[in-house]
């Protein structure tokens, strides 16, 4: 029952809750992972490339779920190369290049051009 409820809440499209995750589409796999990870009390979630390769509808759904979890008090470390996603989803950004933090800024201070330069090792 709990699995069916989570599948419904996260709009997972599968023949049944017993369908192996490997038989699901990429978007449905990501939904299952997020449904599983947020099904118990968490203080922190690491989300690495959570919407990479997903269609626009699955992307919007997962981003909304993450934003709701953040609004509910969950701290999320989002790792992404998609600058628009980072600006949409983040309160604060750290830019890493070659394994080192090369920049940090609030969402309000962030500019796509500046972040892009920092990501490639250039000074912004």
Regions found by a protein language model. Name each.
Residues 1-124:
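Glycine-rich phosphate-binding loops of nucleotide-dependent enzymes
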